[in-house]
Every structure is written in C-alpha cells, then in structure tokens.
Amino acid sequence: MPPLAPLPPLPSTTTAATTRFHASQGAAPHTLVLATEVPVALVINGIAHAVLMATPADLGALALGFLLTEGIIDQASDCYDLQIEPLSAQCVGLPEGIDAVQVDLQIAARCMARLQGKRRSMSGRTGCGVCGVESFVGLDLDCPPVPAAPWLAQVDAPTVLAAMQA
C-alpha cells in the first residue's frame, strides 16, 4: 500500500442537479444540497479500531463521543491527542473517488489497557457493510451498480404524481 498522503479537508456537502415535478407547473430544474459521507477510520494509540461512515465535519467531536459512549475513555481529558487526516482513495486502497478520513487518537494507558482487555464486538453488517470493519483494508466498496427494474421505464412523473394524489 502506498504511504498515506494527506488531502485538503473533504467537503461535508455536495450539490446535485435534479428535476422537480409539480402537478400544476410541470418539470423544473432544481439543485439539491446533500450531506456527504466518507469512510472514517478511528485509530486508537496506533491500532485500527473501527471504520464508520460519517459526514466529514466535526470529526473530533464524533471521535470523542464514540470513545465516551463505547466506554473506551471515562472523560474527554483521557484523550491526550486527536489528529484528523483526510486521505485519498488510492492511499487507502479504496475505489477511485471514495476518499476517506483517518482520526488518530492517543488515549490514557489505563483506558487502552481496559480496551485491550475487552476487545469490542461492533456488529453492523446489516447496513451498508462499513460499520464493524476495523480498518480501510476490510472495506469492500467496489460493487457493481444494481440494474434498474424493467418496469421502471414504464412509470413516468405524471403517473407517479397521479398515484400520490389518489
């Protein structure tokens, strides 16, 4: 794997051009502002602990909240250092266009000893497949697109609007 190369901060929102359909006005172009999500790896005292999907904003608060709610630390002051590093997809072995963030946390030795004594089991495999993975290496995000159902081409916007008003 190539060395980790930092990126500038990743955007927490993106825009998407869409078309809105109004029963009385017809179709009109529209722009949506959407939250973005990226894989975020939490690395505790140099050991990969978990990967989760998150909007790349306020990741320090997210990481501290995770440590507190998982019982890894007892209070925020048990976390001595926190570094947030955006990483390119190429650097962490993800498909092109899926950049990631690594949050490196340094916690008190007593908290780390407790964590190592009770290796956590975070099951999250029923969702998108990211939660519960310990590091970027365990991610399988190179999935083929799901083909559209054949019947979908037969449903147009006026039909959908009529069904919603029924």
Residue ranges and their predicted role:
Residues 2-166:
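Intrinsically disordered, low-complexity regions enriched in acidic/Ser/Thr/Pro/Gln residues
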